[in-house]
Amino acid sequence: ADLIGAVRNDRLLLDEASIPLPLDGRHNARNLLLALAVGSHLGVDPASAAQLQVNIPGGRNRRLQQGGLTLLDETYNASPEAVLAALDLLADQPGRRFAVLGTMLELGDRSIELHQQVAARAAALKLDGVVLVDGGDEGHAMANVASGLDRLALVATPEAAAAPLGQWLKAGDVVLLKASRGVALERLIPLLPSV
């Protein structure tokens, strides 16, 4: 069954229904529309299906308010596509926008290239600041690509990211935290400044 929808603010608009989006981001709105189309094809009313509860574990598409900051907590895992989608979500936020990007692990021979693509997107979005958490080749490659940003820091650990952020952040800022699970970027959250 064909299902056509449009996104307005935090709602998915269908012919017969206005459905609240359970997750942030255009990529998640597309996913919801696809799921509703499959359900509709199987005979499930889209408005009824949209009433289901969405339970997302910590570190996945979680919006937190902490100390005057809005945190987009994506610390659980990262792939190139997921990081690009998260950066686009950050770019859609009002106010000053900062990204803390850790290594994407297990990418094989294309790891450097894929990290450079992510850094290029961060630079193109003209974010207000980026902290890269990686002491290896990937971090240095990302820093070289994003070197035109006014605020850019390369640190070795999540805890070390608190220092540059402490100098940059002000009340009302939005901070994206995104990395592979092995980076344990969630360790940074309690260290972020209250502004």
What kind of feature is each model-predicted range?
Residues A1-L3:
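Conserved phosphate-donor
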Residues G5-R11:
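A short, compositionally biased
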Residues R8, A17-V195:
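ATP-dependent carboxylate-amine ligase
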